[in-house]
A protein has these predicted regions:
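Cell-envelope/extracellular polymer assembly enzymes that use nucleotide-activated donors
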Residues: 5-7, 31
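Catalytic-site signature of metal-activated, phosphate-bearing donor transferases
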Residues: 68-75, 82, 93-187
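Short, well-formed alpha-helical segments that are part of the catalytic scaffolds
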Residues: 10-28
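Catalytic phosphate/metal-binding cores of nucleic-acid and nucleotide-processing enzymes, i.e., regions
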Residues: 10-13, 38, 63-69
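A conserved acidic beta->alpha catalytic loop
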Residues: 17, 25, 36-46, 87
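Internal alpha-helical transmembrane segments
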Residues: 85-86, 90-91
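Conserved donor nucleotide-binding strand/loop of the catalytic core
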Residues: 44-77
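Short beta-strand/loop segment that forms part of the nucleotide-sugar
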Residues: 30-38, 60-62, 88
Length: 187
């Protein structure tokens, strides 16, 4: 698939630690829509610097209305029909990018990528953390996200053709025990 025909949708809030690496992995896509939720760190500066170099990023802003609703709002800003939804703490591996380029998608295709969840930079291969498949590529005229406030996911219609990629996203999930406890308490 031509990556220029895919809009990448990213939600961000205070993502300065991972955003540059995330965006760099997405530079070949036709459009990146970044939906900011009141970042107070250098997130927007990083995004603007990226856009100066690649000219394919658009910044929108919204209050927090729940993750499902925010992701659907972000998708609504996308100019392309095909969507790659990625989190600001995820990085698309080169092998996964090559696999996406080789796809021949029909409108009813929904694509899952495995995530390599990382703890303090190390890949967690046990405890059900890999493969952690997440539905991330879809045609916005076919489906979208559920409206869950947290733990949102792409709705999979019965007539969807499901495709699982062999390659993955690196997910910088947590970097300390403190961040694990913070996430557990938040969600």
């Amino acid at each position: 698939m031509d990556t220029k025909k895919i809009s990448v949708c990213i939600l961000v809030k205070n993502a300065q630690n991972t955003l540059a690496q995330c965006l760099e992995s997405l530079r070949e896509f036709g459009e990146i829509v970044l939906l900011d939720n009141n970042s107070t760190d250098k997130t927007l500066q990083i995004a603007q610097e990226f856009n100066t170099a690649y000219k394919n990023l658009r910044i929108e802003k919204s209050e927090f209305i729940g993750f499902g609703a925010l992701k659907n709002l972000c998708v609504s800003y996308a100019k392309n029909e095909w969507i790659l939804s990625i989190d600001s703490d995820e990085v698309l591996e080169n092998e996964a990018l090559s696999e996406i380029k080789a796809l021949d998608l029909k409108q009813n295709c929904v694509v899952a990528l495995g995530r390599k969840n990382l703890y303090d930079g190390e890949w967690i291969k046990a405890c059900g953390w890999y493969p952690d498949f997440v539905w991330r590529i879809f045609n916005k005229n076919f489906t979208g996200f559920n409206d869950n406030f947290v733990h949102e996911s792409v709705k999979i219609p019965q007539n969807a053709e499901k495709i699982y990629l062999k390659n993955a996203l690196k997910h910088y999930a947590v970097n300390s025990m403190e961040s694990i406890i913070t996430k557990m308490n938040r969600y």
